[in-house]
Regions:
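N-terminal domain-onset segments
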Residues: 1-66, 104-117
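Short, compact, well-ordered microdomains
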Residues: 71-116
């Protein structure tokens, strides 16, 4: 998949929420410096993150923070924010427990904590 796009507002809010939860300082105006690279064919799903002038490549990463929410069909969705070995935003990873398509990203007020693996 070679498609890239701006980060959707719901994703921006979720990334900011997860970064804040981990006390990870995002650079000023970060949402305008990064591009989303969808990693799934679904409208809502995991995205790779890369700066405007870089190419998204697979590399070593680690989970910075995580949360969960319930989709409109009441199925749980886990969300993980990953950073690379340079402490740069790398992926926003979604996993719906029944592997069905994610329908909606709710506001961050709806997010719940989950134990980090």
């Amino acid at each position: 998949m070679e498609y890239k796009r701006k980060i959707f507002p719901e994703e921006v809010a979720l990334i900011a929420f997860l970064a804040s939860k981990a006390q990870f300082l995002l650079e000023s105006n970060w949402e305008n410096k990064f591009i989303a690279y969808p990693l799934t064919k679904e409208k809502i799903g995991s995205i790779g993150l890369f700066k405007n002038n870089q190419k998204y490549t697979r590399r070593q990463s680690r989970v910075l923070s995580c949360c969960k929410f319930h989709d409109v069909d009441n199925v749980e969705v886990a969300v993980y924010l990953l950073i690379d070995s340079n402490d740069t935003l790398y992926e926003l990873d979604f996993w719906k427990v029944d592997d069905s398509e994610i329908c909606h990203i709710p506001s961050v007020d709806s997010m719940e904590d989950i134990p980090q693996i």
